[in-house]
């Protein structure tokens, strides 16, 4: 993971542990965060100062979204990564759900490669709906790269719909 640079990274989302793991593994990163987190005292300020993007660019967050998107291309070119959980929420059954296309649109706009990551078993350690860690079972958390979509030419990046199909295909192949 440490070798990934200048990329948009999409990952399945199973548990509240997932963003913490990716933050720990990725040296220079930004991410798209649920907009409501930006309204929380102190935490919202920290997210804004860290360069994170609100998931919605509506209302009071429009200016922040525009500012962050305008700087994204140079951030990626300097070796930074943008990671996102494109489902926008945790999966309750472990299967990939419908994807929001925001990260894929940013990849096209910035002509950045898209790395598709798959996390496994974080939901067994920190089950959605539970408050405590489940330490009664033996569990191995894994994270692997299951696809990398490289731009072939600045003017020839696949459409957002094609990128979405390829991401979904990579996840569905892993679920078999």
Where do the language-model regions lie?
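Non-catalytic C-terminal accessory region of glycerolipid acyltransferases
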Residues: 66-176
């Amino acid at each position: 993971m440490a070798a990934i640079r200048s990329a948009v990274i999409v990952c399945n989302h199973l548990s509240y542990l997932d963003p913490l793991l990716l933050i720990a593994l990725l040296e220079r990163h930004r991410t798209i965060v649920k907009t409501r987190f930006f309204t929380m005292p102190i935490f919202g300020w920290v997210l804004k100062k860290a360069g994170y993007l609100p998931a919605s660019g509506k209302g009071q967050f429009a200016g922040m979204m525009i500012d962050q998107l305008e700087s994204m291309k140079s951030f990626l070119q300097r070796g930074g990564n943008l990671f996102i959980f494109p489902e926008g929420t945790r999966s309750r059954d472990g299967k990939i759900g419908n994807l929001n296309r925001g990260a894929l649109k940013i990849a096209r706009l910035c002509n950045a490669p898209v790395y598709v990551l798959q996390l496994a078993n974080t939901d067994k350690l920190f089950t959605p709906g539970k408050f405590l860690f489940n330490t009664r079972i033996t569990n191995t958390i894994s994270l692997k790269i299951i696809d990398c979509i490289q731009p072939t030419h600045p003017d020839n990046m696949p459409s957002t719909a094609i990128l979405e199909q390829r991401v979904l295909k990579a996840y569905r192949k892993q679920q078999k």
